[in-house]
């Protein structure tokens, strides 16, 4: 038991991490096991209840226990679970990313498919926080592993190209990478439909941003029709895709179509999840934005209010998140030609 705990501790950030969080990652019911290790002197602890391994102990543990993907699967699964909880932010994300970085550097890769999946699940969460250092490490690691043709799947190769496109600054290069990613997948199946839909959405987004509305429309519509075809409209990925498509339709002077897509999505989220979750709020906020763009203030107000009611409930302990949202919407007003600015908070709270 203790050796297993030690073996996972090799990946802790050198600045340490909260004992409670670490115990949760390892699914330990209590802190007893960690406290025992602190008592033996193997694990260092500070006043703030953070734990870390002494570098010398770390070195010995690495060579003695050889932590591997198979052996440390609970830790890897826990980190992936956090990265896959859409819309849920954790305040220790830097420590999480440092731990992932140490895993990449130090773990024995004895189960390659499981390891590749770990990298692929962590990358989008790093992207949320624009954690470039970690994103670059993951891309490099995937490149190294996927060089031999017999390792990995078409989907792995498509994801690598998609990740590279995410970090690519030149639009034409990013577009080429997304097209190459799509070319990796010959047959669309239930297993890869979500990925292919995402790739079309990303490509559509790039075309939209670079002034190719016809191509943007083609790929955005393909992306949504795949979600529809494979009954995936209720999953988290569909939300940004449909929201972006609705905004695109509004830019193309078709706001009614955009609004009807979003209302359909609202219904689906309500049916599969609830009407007080973060995803529902995001859709309400997008509806508010479109009504703003079409100068329909009463409707805009209704939808923003609905969104904020949910944000204020979910982020009750994080007033700065709510404040940041207010700021974000406040900036929308002048951009869209309304200079209501300061009255916004008043407008929404009435």
Predicted region positions:
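Extended alpha-helical scaffolding segments used for macromolecular assembly and cargo binding
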Residues: 1, 71-145, 149-152, 156
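C-terminal boundary/linker of central alpha/beta nucleotide-binding cores
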Residues: 1-65, 72-77
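Amphipathic alpha-helical segments of tetratricopeptide repeats
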Residues: 104-105, 140-147, 180-187, 224-229, ...
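Short coil/turn linkers that connect adjacent helices within long alpha-helical scaffolds
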Residues: 109-110, 148-152, 187-191, 229-233, ...
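Conserved alpha-helical positions within TPR/SEL1-like repeat arrays
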Residues: 120-127, 155-170, 194-209, 220, ...
């Amino acid at each position: 038991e203790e050796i297993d705990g030690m073996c996972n501790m090799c990946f802790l950030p050198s600045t340490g991490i909260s004992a409670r969080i670490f115990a949760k990652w390892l699914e330990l019911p209590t802190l007893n096991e960690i406290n025992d290790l602190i008592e033996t002197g193997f694990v260092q602890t500070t006043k703030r209840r953070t734990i870390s391994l002494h570098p010398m102990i770390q070195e010995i543990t690495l060579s003695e226990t050889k932590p591997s993907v198979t052996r440390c699967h609970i830790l890897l699964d826990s980190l992936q679970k956090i990265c896959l909880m859409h819309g849920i932010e954790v305040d220790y994300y830097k420590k999480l990313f440092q731990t992932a970085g140490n895993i990449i550097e130090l773990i024995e890769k004895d189960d390659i498919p499981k390891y590749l999946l770990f990298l692929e699940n962590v990358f989008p969460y790093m992207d949320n926080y624009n954690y470039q250092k970690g994103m670059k490490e993951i891309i490099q690691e995937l490149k190294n592993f996927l060089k031999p043709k017999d390792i990995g799947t078409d989907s792995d190769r498509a994801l690598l190209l998609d990740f590279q496109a995410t970090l690519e600054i030149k639009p034409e290069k990013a577009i080429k990478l997304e097209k190459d990613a799509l070319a990796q997948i010959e047959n669309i199946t239930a297993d890869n439909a979500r990925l292919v839909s995402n790739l079309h959405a990303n490509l559509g987004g790039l075309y939209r941003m670079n002034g190719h509305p016809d191509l943007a429309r083609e790929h955005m519509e393909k992306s949504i029709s795949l979600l529809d075809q494979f009954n995936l409209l209720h999953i988290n990925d569909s939300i940004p895709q449909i929201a972006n498509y609705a905004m695109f339709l509004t830019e193309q002077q078709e706001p009614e179509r955009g609004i009807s897509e979003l209302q359909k999505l609202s219904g689906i989220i309500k049916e599969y999840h609830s009407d007080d979750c973060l995803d529902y709020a995001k859709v309400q906020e997008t509806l508010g934005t479109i009504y703003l763009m079409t100068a329909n203030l009463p409707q805009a107000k209704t939808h923003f209010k609905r969104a904020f009611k949910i944000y204020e409930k979910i982020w009750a302990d994080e007033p700065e998140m709510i404040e940041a949202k207010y700021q974000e919407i406040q900036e929308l007003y002048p951009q869209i030609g309304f200079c209501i600015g300061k009255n916004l908070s008043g407008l929404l709270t009435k």
